[in-house]
């Protein structure tokens, strides 16, 4: 069973952190299969690193529950099951609903301007049918909400959820057919901010996460 940690991708990160993000992605995308034995030398060659950062990354992956160490046999891939992803979505929904409630109550004028600008970019790139840009902007929209909640631990948890969940069927979620639907879901969330209604924000976020789960998990 996947064990959640606060590890997230960081731009310009140290080698071990960047390596960890790459290995997480390879496991979650199925490049490294559940049950597969990890051969350290092969991974050192694959990622262009020495054994020290590789072992640091493996220890963190073990803490996350993505790999397991078996005495006298080495590391093996566990990965994440469909059920693990579904469970994570349930947790994410609860935390996102709390985050948006607090964010609407606590958002600053500057953060509100950033949220409005981000939503306008979502409208623009939906019109352009640019799925890659929407992937980035969607994450940014939610990140502003996390920061506006003024709860550092909640922000770290939700940022980490995003870093894992984005690997679950991203090609389905960001098909052109879904872009207008995504936009309208975020429009409802944004309207709750402009109306100053935490209740509407919680409801809009619940609908959005439920639909996101359906799109990703089926």
For the regions a language model picked out, list residue spans one by one.
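Positions in alpha-helical segments
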Residues: 75, 83, 101, 120, ...
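Hydrophobic, amphipathic alpha-helical faces that serve as interaction scaffolds
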Residues: 91-106, 139-176, 216
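Residue-level recognition of alpha-helical structural elements
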Residues: 84, 108-111, 130-134, 150, ...
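Hydrophobic packing residues in well-ordered alpha-helices of helical domains and bundles
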Residues: 88, 115, 134, 138, ...
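Amphipathic alpha-helical dimerization/coiled-coil segments
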Residues: 95-123
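Short linear motifs at protein or domain termini
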Residues: 1-101, 105, 147, 217-218
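Hydrophobic face of alpha-helices
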Residues: 20, 24, 96, 138, ...
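C-terminal all-alpha effector/ligand-binding and dimerization domain
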Residues: 2, 11-15, 116-123, 128, ...
């Amino acid at each position: 069973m996947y064990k959640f940690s606060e590890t997230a991708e960081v731009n310009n990160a140290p080698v071990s952190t960047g390596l960890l993000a790459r290995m997480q992605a390879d496991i979650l995308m199925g490049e490294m299969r559940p049950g597969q034995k990890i051969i350290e030398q092969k991974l050192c060659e694959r990622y262009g690193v020495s054994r020290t950062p590789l072992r640091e990354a493996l220890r963190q992956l073990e803490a996350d529950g993505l790999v397991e160490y078996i005495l006298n046999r080495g590391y093996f891939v566990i990965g994440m099951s469909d059920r693990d992803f579904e469970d994570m979505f349930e947790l994410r929904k609860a935390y996102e609903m709390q985050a948006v409630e607090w964010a609407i109550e606590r958002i600053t004028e500057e953060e509100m301007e950033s949220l409005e600008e981000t939503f306008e970019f979502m409208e623009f790139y939906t019109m352009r049918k640019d799925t890659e840009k929407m992937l980035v902007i969607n994450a940014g929209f939610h990140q502003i909400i996390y920061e506006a909640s003024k709860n550092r631990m909640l922000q770290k948890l939700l940022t980490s959820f995003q870093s894992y969940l984005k690997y679950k069927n991203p090609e389905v979620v960001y098909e052109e057919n879904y872009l207008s639907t995504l936009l309208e879901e975020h429009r409802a969330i944004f309207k709750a901010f402009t109306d100053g209604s935490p209740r509407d924000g919680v409801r809009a976020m619940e609908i959005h996460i439920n639909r996101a789960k359906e799109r990703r998990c089926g």
